[in-house]
Amino acid sequence: MNGFSPYQTGCHVLIADGLKGTDETLVPVNGEYVKEAKIGSAIMDADVFISLTHFKGHETAGFGGTIKNIGMGCGSRAGKMEQHCEGKPSVATEACIGCGACGRICAHGAPVITDHKAKIDHDKCVGCGRCLAVCPKDAISADYADSVAMLNYKMAEYSLAVCQNRPCFHVSLICDVSPNCDCHPENDIPILPNIGMLASFDPVALDQACADLCNQATPVESSVLGKNIAHAHEHHEECDHDHFHMTHPDTCLLYTSPSPRDQRGS
């Protein structure tokens, strides 16, 4: 979908968790939310880990940076499900038209149409949120306050599982800063101008630096971010200085500018 093949990259492409997503290594992490991360075996077989990240907005995580790329990207299919399993959506029956789009997009058969209304089986649902994106009536919603917080906690602990006890290096590209995740086959125009390439041995420092630069940049006026800011000004609403929170207010992630001590690198 995103063009990662030997023909485009000029090198071999390995699917880290195998052809069916079941080739995984259980990595002890002893986190608060994850005790044993399910990581694609090819990732854990590597002596050195190098990540390359496209920094962008994200409709659930706030922004997609190095930590999200490592934590979610290196998880096996079961690992991805474990990270997504909070904040399961529900259907507002009065708004549902029974079109079945949610059922067709779901890989787990969670949405079921009964009497022309959809209902989501939470025992089957993994909380991936695809059904929210395809509903033509916005009849599906999730408790984002819980799901966003838990998703970010788990991604951080999965990233620790990948990076601990071996040499790591991380590169992040701040270009074509799309409002949504690259998982989608489509996207909107970039919310920010191209900024450049950053690199670090520390994934947390790298994400912080990328967020700092993005929040210092002038938004693209015709983007969803630019329109949200214009709408806030027009209606005399409070305008958040966090560009990613302004793009996706439901993420509940608020940017904290670095202190002078942090900016000096001390």
What would you call each of these model-derived segments?
Residues 1-64:
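An acidic, phosphate/nucleotide-engaging active-site surface
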Residues 5-8, 35-45, 59, 74, ...:
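Solvent-exposed alpha-helices and their adjacent loops that cap or buttress functional pockets
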Residues 28-38, 69-78, 83, 88-91, ...:
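Active-site glycine-rich loop that binds ribose-phosphate moieties when present
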Residues 74-133, 139-147:
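Ferredoxin-like iron-sulfur electron-transfer modules
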Residues 112-114, 142-146, 219-250:
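Flexible, glycine/charged-enriched surface loops at secondary-structure junctions
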Residues 133, 137, 142-153, 167-198:
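Conserved mixed alpha/beta catalytic, RNA-binding, or beta-rich assembly cores of soluble enzyme
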Residues 187-236:
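A hydrophobic, small-residue-rich beta->alpha segment in the mid-to-C-terminal subdomain
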Residues 255-260:
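Conserved small/polar residues in nucleotide/adenosyl-binding loops
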